[in-house]
């Protein structure tokens, strides 16, 4: 299913500028997993910081603010994996509530396992998150499935979520992933509705799909997602597009045999975790994690 109208927000790496530098040089050092919210005449950006396996993995989630959406100052908040009692942190989800308060959803790895869970904390401002006050909102199942990287929106009076699921029953299959869709009246109690997007045999996304950003437009839904063809491409996923009229039934737009819609020009080609934030005045800013020439991952941005 081809639809060039859905390419409007695809990353163009040549137009990207650096937003957050990785915490070191070389493979395994990442700044990325962005979640952006336009507020207070600027952009709040939540992101994950990571070191290589054996050197800390996903060691912190930070939140920073920039008036221009590009030049972020020192973080207004930093949450460490030690504070969360987790082996590693992944992409956060920052949400502003209708009453002006804020929520931060955190993906947490259970030590010694492949299991992931999602916890949530709430505060009056992004600088005031206190993770001593938090709850598990998506527990997963330590023997059956890991749940992480939720993408959450409020639309038409309902909460929508697309979360990444990894199967755990077979140790050789835990790198596989699908995106499952859920709804909620409050963003806390979720009801799973089904598989929104899964890999296609023989295609560039055959090993797994992870929805990263979603846009509603009337009766249609467009999702930008990360995909990989093999376990070897873990950490170097690339970006594709899926569409549908139902948020639980998305169809990839790339033709059979075609590659991803966007990738890094460097090394493994990783270009993932795209996030879109609409700005006052009608423009949109893109944030995404992209592999650099030295193998590290930087958080970059574009303005459309």
Model feature map: region roles:
Residues 1-87, 95-207, 215-269, 278-304:
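Beta-rich carbohydrate-recognition and catalytic domains
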Residues 91:
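Peripheral membrane lipid-binding modules
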């Amino acid at each position: 299913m081809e639809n060039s109208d859905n390419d409007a927000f695809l990353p163009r790496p040549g137009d990207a500028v650096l937003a957050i530098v990785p915490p070191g040089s070389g493979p395994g050092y990442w700044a990325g997993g962005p979640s952006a919210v336009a507020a207070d005449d600027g952009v709040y950006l939540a992101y994950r910081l990571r070191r290589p396996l054996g050197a800390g993995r996903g060691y912190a989630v930070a939140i920073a603010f920039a008036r221009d959406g590009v030049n972020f100052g020192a973080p207004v908040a930093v949450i460490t994996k030690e504070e969360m009692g987790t082996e590693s942190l992944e992409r956060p989800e920052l949400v502003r509530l209708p009453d002006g308060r804020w929520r931060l959803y955190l993906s947490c790895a259970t030590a010694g396992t492949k299991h992931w869970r999602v916890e949530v904390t709430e505060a009056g401002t992004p600088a005031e998150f206190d993770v001593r006050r938090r709850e598990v909102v998506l527990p997963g199942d330590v023997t059956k499935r890991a749940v992480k990287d939720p993408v959450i929106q409020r639309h038409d009076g309902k909460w929508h979520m697309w979360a990444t699921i990894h199967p755990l029953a077979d140790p050789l299959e835990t790198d596989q992933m699908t995106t499952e869709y859920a709804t909620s009246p409050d963003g806390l109690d979720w009801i799973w509705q089904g598989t929104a997007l899964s890999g296609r045999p023989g295609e560039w996304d055959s090993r797994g799909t992870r929805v990263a950003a979603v846009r509603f437009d009337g009766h249609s839904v467009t999702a930008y997602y990360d995909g990989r063809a093999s376990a070897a491409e873990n950490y170097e996923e690339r970006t594709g597009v899926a569409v549908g009229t139902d948020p639980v039934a998305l169809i990839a737009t790339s033709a059979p045999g075609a590659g991803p819609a966007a990738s890094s020009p460097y090394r493994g080609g990783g270009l993932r975790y795209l996030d879109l934030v609409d700005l006052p005045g009608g423009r949109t800013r893109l944030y995404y994690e992209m592999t650099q020439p030295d193998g590290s991952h930087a958080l970059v941005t574009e303005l459309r």
